[in-house]
Amino acid sequence: MTTGRLGQRAVPPNAAYAGQVVHFPDPVRATRHPRGVRVDEHGYPDFSLYARAVAEIAEPPEGFGVDELRLTDYVSANAALAASGHELWDTVPAVATPHGWTWHHAAGGRRLELVPVEVKALLRHHGGIATSTVDQHKRGTRPLQETRPVHFALPKSAVAVTEQQVQGVEEDLGYRLPGAYRSFLKAAGGSAPIGTALDAELGLLIDQPFFTVRDEAAVNDLVYVNKCLRDHLTKDYLAVGFVQGGLLAVKVKGQGLGSVWFCAYDDARDVDPAWAPADRVERLLLPAGGDFDQFLGRLAGNPPELETVANLMVDGGFARSVPVPSAAAVGE
């Protein structure tokens, strides 16, 4: 079995920044987070400065795959913080991540830090998933016993994004958006699943609002945020939302137009600095649907298995909330 121990010996992506502080290149994030992100001497980013909550999770069982690890850790960390009475979980289900936040696995251990979604997206990196002992090539999670469709919290207005706004986006981007995603953006841009949504084939926990169209520069504006994500994707892909553990993207140019892909952070396969960006995305992106409608059809809304697993982890003492480092200072 090929395990994550390979990742421990591999040079992390962007290891050239080892021992340095990487600052946010765009004005919105640079203003919000002027301290940037320090990359340690081994090439792993240290996001602890931005941690709003921290959880520790027990070692995974023998034979666990990377998608199982990622999903189990996220829902267990959420449940542990919800059980602790953390204020961010006042308005979301126990297994969901608060909007605007994502979990980062600190390298070399089983510590998870809750950091702003736009901070973790700064650069390609390795962390505690790439350095874990799980099978990095075993994909997917256990099949669900039954699936219910996902529902979105839609705006009270007739549409979330107007046709005029969509045309403005297309003018800025230089191409027409693929049809299925275009329809979703108009109906539900900026909306999040009610509770959680799960793509069991990839173990994707989807609990964040999708990108929308804003009148001003913002980290949830479709055009602006894609300018911030060029370390992750080529211009053949348009990022459409943050999911736990990475980005969701739509193919907007070339073969497979309109198809949906998962771009994972902390990917143990991302080890060759000689790969050109186009080669890297071709090798690393994981398919999530032939078009956006197919992607939505793969999702299960609020599967009870998530809560069952998370409760077992918390009640058994395998997932627990721990104090946030005293130096953490979000958004200074």
What residue spans do the PLM features occupy?
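Short, surface-exposed beta-strand/loop micro-motifs that present aromatic residues
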Residues: 104, 239, 247-253
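Short, surface-exposed beta-strand/loop "edge" segments at domain boundaries and coil↔beta transitions
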Residues: 63-65, 141, 246-249, 267-276
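Acidic, proline/glycine-rich low-complexity IDRs
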Residues: 135-138, 142-146, 292-332
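A short, compositionally biased micro-patch
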Residues: 109, 243, 253-255
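Compact, glycine/acidic-enriched structural inserts
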Residues: 261-298
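Nuclease and nuclease-like effector domains acting on nucleic acids or nucleotide cofactors
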Residues: 1-102, 106-148
